[in-house]
């Protein structure tokens, strides 16, 4: 539980048992992790091998990200002070988007989605999330600012021949055909806007 902020703050957000205790293995913590999931305190977002529907058919059993039930709780676990929050963009620099990803995960779950994520076997591309949507898959890239670059997302869309990909950021709504930008504040409407 206490390792969650550090796990999410890493560039590669895949959950690593070795970060809990040197040499730790999944079996050492699987009961504790299951307890946290059973009580709805954390949510497991599995890694998938392909962005194809249904996503559950492509889940890796060992690769996953772990998200807290609530952005505020993650902030408290992280020792996030009101001064940092009120300082604006500095909070996103400090956590490299982890709070933003937490927020998006929370919104996707609230809308009844079951998010997953994809990363290439070579490690050169990753989608922050992917959801089943109207018989296909919507990959999502989360940006904590107005950065509109989406290299990994474009790679994923081309590789899996997806008709629609979503980037969410502080920028306004923008439909560029295959790629649509949904403002972070509106990500709860992904089913209607994508």
Where are these regions (language model features)?
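Accessory nucleic acid-recognition modules appended to NTPase machines
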Residues: 1-132
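Catalytic cores of nucleic-acid endonucleases
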Residues: 144-185
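C-terminal helix of von Willebrand factor
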Residues: 183-194
């Amino acid at each position: 539980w206490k390792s969650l902020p550090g796990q999410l703050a890493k560039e590669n957000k895949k959950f690593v048992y070795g970060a809990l205790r040197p040499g730790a293995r999944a079996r050492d913590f699987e009961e504790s992790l299951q307890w946290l999931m059973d009580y709805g305190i954390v949510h497991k977002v599995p890694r998938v091998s392909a962005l194809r529907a249904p996503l559950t058919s492509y889940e890796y059993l060992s690769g996953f990200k772990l998200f807290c039930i609530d952005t505020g709780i993650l902030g408290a676990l992280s020792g996030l002070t009101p001064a940092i929050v009120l300082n604006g963009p500095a909070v996103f620099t400090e956590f490299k988007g982890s709070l933003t990803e937490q927020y998006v995960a929370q919104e996707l779950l609230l809308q009844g989605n079951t998010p997953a994520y994809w990363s290439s076997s070579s490690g050169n591309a990753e989608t922050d999330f992917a959801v089943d949507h109207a018989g296909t898959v919507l990959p999502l890239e989360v940006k904590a600012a107005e950065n509109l670059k989406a290299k990994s997302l474009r790679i994923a869309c081309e590789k899996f021949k997806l008709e629609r990909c979503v980037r969410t950021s502080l920028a306004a709504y923008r439909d560029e055909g295959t790629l649509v930008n949904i403002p972070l504040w509106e990500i709860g409407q992904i089913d209607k806007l994508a």
